[in-house]
Regions:
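N-terminal glycine-rich FAD/FM-binding segment characteristic of electron-transfer flavoproteins
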Residues: 1-294
Length: 294
């Protein structure tokens, strides 16, 4: 495989189902209290990577940072066609903001090495900052191309793509390696049955150890068996990626979230307007006067 594509994906809390205990006293999201889903725009990034795999016979690596349960989004990535999966998990990574997260993921990218393209969703729905992708690019000192809709061509070490801008789009060319953030621009493919059957037993070392917690010998045997079948999801700690302890997790995060809540917009007073030019003109004047418009 000539082209190597790294896709950073994320398991996020379903922010449409915020409960009363969604925040910890320290100001971080209590992920255990919320249903977990595959971050939507990361699915778009994965789909774009898989389209490039189909076109250029690329290798697609899915990687994520999170709790051990985040291995599920990696399995979902394998089911859709990713070739390899990496989980970066460590208690020291908990409470990370975008600064600490991007540093950790840049360390992960360096350990994987050799990626021609790094793809991320534009933003994660649990933060809506759109900061992590560009920050990774800055830390890796590679070009960043944001709001990508389509890859036109990859040729002679350069990528030509289309990205959305306000009021239209632009066509850009960039040298590789480069990082792309991808918007909701495609329809992510469903799980591939063949890939599902192949990877349904893909697990991390921690998951296997948990299943055989009373029998370490059997656990080691199962780990070796899973690895031999190519089904062991790689699992790295902060030390494995050589991350600076002062720059990760809560310790490396200057941002603290005070509160997360679902906001439901409801109608207040209602006013019926006659479908005449004078009535509509009067309504427009009223809306402009109270600064609802303009």
């Amino acid at each position: 495989m000539g082209l190597k594509i790294l896709v950073f994906v994320k398991q996020v809390p379903d922010t449409q189902n915020i409960s009363g205990n969604a925040m910890t006293p320290e100001g971080t999201v209590n992920r255990a209290a919320l249903p977990a889903i595959f971050n939507p725009e990361d699915l778009n990034a994965l789909e774009l990577a898989l389209q490039l795999k189909d076109r250029y016979n690329a290798e697609v690596i899915a990687a994520t940072m999170g709790m051990p349960a985040a291995a599920e989004v990696l399995r979902q990535s394998l089911y859709r066609g990713a070739d390899r999966a990496v989980l970066v998990t460590d208690r020291a990574l908990a409470g990370a903001d975008t600064l600490a997260t991007s540093y950790t993921l840049s360390c992960c990218a360096k350990k994987i090495g050799g990626a021609d393209l790094i793809l991320c969703g534009r933003q994660a729905i649990d933060g809506d900052t759109a900061q992590t992708g560009p920050q990774i690019a800055e830390k890796l000192n590679i070009p960043q191309l944001c709001y990508v809709e389509e890859v036109k061509e990859i040729k002679e070490g350069k990528i030509t793509l289309r990205r959305a801008i306000e009021g239209g789009y632009e066509i850009l060319e960039s040298p590789m390696p480069a990082l792309l953030t991808v918007i909701d621009c495609n329809l992510p493919r469903p799980v591939n049955v063949k890939s599902l059957m192949k990877n349904k037993r893909a697990k991390t070392k921690s998951e296997i150890m948990g299943e055989y917690k009373n029998d370490p010998t059997a656990a080691e045997a199962e780990i070796a068996k899973t690895a031999a079948k190519g089904l062991l999801i790689e699992e790295w700690s902060a030390a494995d990626i050589e991350a600076d302890p002062e720059r990760i997790g809560f310790a490396g995060s200057p941002t603290k979230v005070k509160q997360v809540q679902s906001v439901i917009l409801t109608a207040g007073d209602a006013k019926t307007v006659e479908p005449t030019a004078d009535a509509i003109a009067e309504l427009m004047h009223e809306l402009i006067s109270d600064h609802t418009l303009g």
